[in-house]
A protein has these predicted regions:
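Linker/hinge segments immediately adjacent to helix-turn-helix/homeobox DNA-binding domains
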Residues: 1-22, 28-29, 37-44, 77-82
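Alpha-helical structural signal
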Residues: 23, 54, 67-70, 75
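Recognition helix of helix-turn-helix DNA-binding domains
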Residues: 35-68
Length: 82
């Protein structure tokens, strides 16, 4: 198997960004267009906690917005249709 095929079979292993499980949840809800308040209601946490996770996600992806983080996550194969 060539390197390209191996990499495309395991995109998460090759993704340059490592998110915590909670950051992954927050990112998924961001992809669905939810606000920090809405995500807080869904995950049973405070809006400020969601904003903390969003800040970490933006820093890890080195992007300025949630939309840019979602786009990068899709490119890296980190978000799939549920």
């Amino acid at each position: 198997m060539n390197d390209h095929a191996r990499h495309s079979q395991h995109p998460l292993a090759d993704a340059p960004v490592r998110l915590t499980p909670r950051e992954q949840q927050v990112l998924l809800w961001c992809a669905y267009g939810k606000s920090s308040w809405e995500i807080g209601q869904i995950l049973a946490c405070k809006e400020s906690t969601v904003n903390f996770h969003v800040s970490n996600i933006l820093r890890k992806f080195d992007v300025p917005t949630r939309v840019a983080a979602v786009i990068k996550a899709i490119r890296y194969g980190m978000l799939a249709e549920q």
